[in-house]
A protein has these predicted regions:
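Short, surface-exposed loop or secondary-structure junction motifs
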Residues: 83, 130, 134-377
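Short, well-ordered beta-strand elements
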Residues: 392-393, 399-408
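Short, conserved catalytic-motif segment at the N-terminal edge
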Residues: 25-29, 35-98, 118-120, 134-141, ...
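Bacterial N-terminal signal peptides
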Residues: 8-19
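N-terminal secretory signal peptides that target proteins for export/translocation
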Residues: 1-4
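Active-site SXXK
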Residues: 45-52, 65, 71-73, 96-125, ...
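Sec/Tat signal peptide C-region and signal peptidase I cleavage site
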Residues: 20-24
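A short acidic/glycine-rich loop-to-helix N-cap element
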Residues: 408-419
Length: 433
C-alpha cells in the first residue's frame, strides 16, 4: 500500500536544472508596471501609498507585497523594518514565519500523490493512519470537563480531512475538553509527526465526521500521510517535488545559519509605550534555528515573498511554472472548489472564512458567492493566511494574486484599518471598469 513515490525522469531533470537558478534569475524579478499588468497607474500608486502608510502608522513594523496579473508583476515593494530592536530593514530577501500558509503547500503535496493513485477522497483516513481505526467522538461534557464518548459512527474520510470536517480539534482556541487535551498533551509541540499522530489518536473527535466544520490539526495529519505514502520524510518530499522544481530556495522548516540575518521578528502594539515592540521568542515550541524541529504541515514553514509568489503563480497557471508541472489543471481546480455542504459554518477559522458566500476546498477557503461575501473578488477566489499576519488570495477569473508578508501577533494599534480589505478594494478599483 505504502509504495515509494517515484519521480519521473523528466521531472528530475527539470529539478536539477532549476536548482542551479539563483534568486535573482527567477520570476518575479522586477515589476512590469501597472499598465503592463492591466491596472491603472493611479490605482497601483494608491495601493503602494496605502501599504506604506500602514507601516508608517506602526500598524506593522514592515511589509513586502506583490500584486501580479496574467504573469505580469504590477508592484513588488517593501516598507519598514524586519526587526525593530536592531533596525534591520525589510527587504525582498527577508524570511517569514508563514504559519498556516504552509497548509496549501501540504495540500499540493497530497494532491500530487492523489494523481499517482495512492489515495482517493472517499478512503477512510484510517487506511493510511491505522492509529485512527478506533476513534471516539465527544457527544457532551460537564462543567468539570468530563466527556461522554461514543464510537464514531462513520469513520472520517480523506475528503473530510482535506476540508476540516473530520471532527479533529486543534488546541489553538476553544475551552472544550477536546481542545484542552490538545494543549495539555502539547500536540503541536511534538518532536516528530509519528509522535503527533500518537497523541492525536488518544483525543476524541469534537463531532461526528461531516456534521460540522472546525479549523483543525487535519493538515498536520495530511503531512504525515504524505510521509507515509511517499516513503520520504515530509520535508524531503516537499524539497524534491515542490521547492526544487519551483526554485523556492528559501522555503524550509527551519532557518539556516547563513540566513539568520534575513529572518524577520514578530511585533505587536504596546499600549503603555504607544509603539510597536518586538515580541520575545516562544518557549513552548522548538526554535526556528533547530533543523530537527517538527515538520508541521499545518504551520511549520519559513519562506520569502519571492518563493511564495512562485508557488502562487504556479496555482494561477493551473499547476505549472517555468515548464515545471507540479499538478494537473484538474487537481488545482479540485483544490479551489468548495466541497462543504451549504449549511456547514466555518467556525474556528482565523480568517474571514465563515462569512456568507464562502466555503472550503483543499486547504483553501473559497469565495463561492462574492455578493453574499461582500467582496469585489471574482467567484472562485481562494485564499488563506498565517498566524503572524501573512496573507494571499488568488482570483482565477482575473489570473491575479496578491501576497502580503508581515510579522505581527497580539495587540494592534487602536483604530488600525484592515489592511487586507484596504489592499483588496484598491486593487479591484484599479482594474478597467
Amino acid at each position: 500500500m505504502f509504495q515509494r513515490f517515484k519521480l519521473g525522469v523528466v521531472s528530475l531533470c527539470i529539478s536539477l536544472l532549476l536548482s542551479t537558478t539563483s534568486f535573482a534569475d527567477s520570476w518575479p524579478i522586477a515589476e512590469a508596471g501597472a499598465s503592463a499588468a492591466g491596472f491603472s497607474e493611479e490605482g497601483i500608486a494608491k495601493l503602494d501609498a496605502a501599504m506604506n502608510k500602514i507601516v508608517a502608522d506602526q500598524d506593522v513594523a514592515g511589509m513586502v507585497w506583490i500584486l501580479a496579473k496574467d504573469g505580469h508583476v504590477a508592484t513588488y515593494e517593501t516598507a519598514g523594518l524586519a526587526r525593530i530592536d536592531d533596525q534591520a530593514p525589510m527587504t525582498k530577501e527577508s524570511l517569514f514565519r508563514i504559519y498556516s500558509m504552509t497548509k496549501p503547500v501540504t495540500g499540493v503535496a497530497l494532491m500530487m500523490l492523489h494523481e499517482q493513485g495512492l489515495w482517493d477522497f472517499d478512503d477512510p483516513i484510517s487506511k493510511f493512519v491505522p492509529e485512527f481505526k478506533d476513534l471516539k467522538v465527544m457527544t457532551s461534557y460537564n462543567d468539570a470537563g468530563e466527556m461522554v464518548l461514543e464510537p464514531v459512527k462513520n469513520p472520517p474520510t480523506m475528503r473530510q480531512l482535506l476540508n476540516h470536517s473530520a471532527g479533529f480539534g486543534y488546541g489553538l482556541g476553544g475551552s472544550d475538553p477536546v481542545n484542552e487535551a490538545f494543549r495539555n498533551t502539547q500536540v503541536l509541540a511534538s518532536d516528530d509527526l509519528d509522535t503527533l499522530i500518537e497523541r492525536v489518536a488518544e483525543i476524541p473527535l469534537m463531532f461526528e465526521p461531516g456534521e460540522a466544520w472546525y479549523y483543525s490539526v487535519a493538515v498536520d495529519i495530511q503531512g504525515y500521510i504524505v510521509q507515509r505514502l511517499s516513503g520520504m520524510t515530509f520535508g524531503e518530499f516537499l524539497e524534491q517535488n515542490i521547492f526544487t522544481p519551483l526554485d523556492m530556495t528559501d522555503t524550509r522548516f527551519f532557518v539556516q545559519p547563513q540566513d539568520q540575518q534575513r529572518f524577520t521578528e514578530v511585533h505587536n502594539w504596546d499600549e503603555e509605550r504607544q509603539r510597536l515592540v518586538q515580541r520575545p521568542h516562544r518557549t513552548d515550541r522548538p526554535s526556528y534555528l533547530d533543523p530537527d524541529r517538527l515538520e508541521s504541515g499545518g504551520g511549520g514553514l519559513v519562506s520569502s515573498t519571492h518563493d511564495y509568489a512562485r508557488f502562487l503563480q504556479m496555482l494561477v497557471n493551473e499547476g505549472e511554472l517555468d515548464s515545471a508541472r507540479i499538478l494537473s489543471p484538474e487537481s488545482v481546480r479540485i483544490m479551489r472548489t468548495n466541497s462543504l455542504r451549504d449549511e456547514l459554518n466555518l467556525r474556528g477559522s482565523p480568517t474571514s472564512a465563515g462569512q456568507p458566500g464562502q466555503g472550503f476546498g483543499v486547504d483553501f477557503a473559497v469565495i463561492s458567492d462574492p455578493s453574499k461575501a461582500n467582496s469585489p473578488q471574482g467567484a472562485g477566489t481562494y485564499y488563506w493566511s498565517g498566524a503572524a499576519g501573512t496573507w494571499f488570495w488568488i482570483d482565477p477569473t482575473e489570473d491575479m494574486f496578491l501576497i502580503g508578508m508581515i510579522q505581527a501577533q497580539g495587540p494592534t494599534r487602536p483604530g488600525a484599518p484592515n489592511m487586507r480589505n484596504v489592499a483588496r478594494d484598491i486593487i479591484y478599483a484599479s482594474l478597467p471598469q
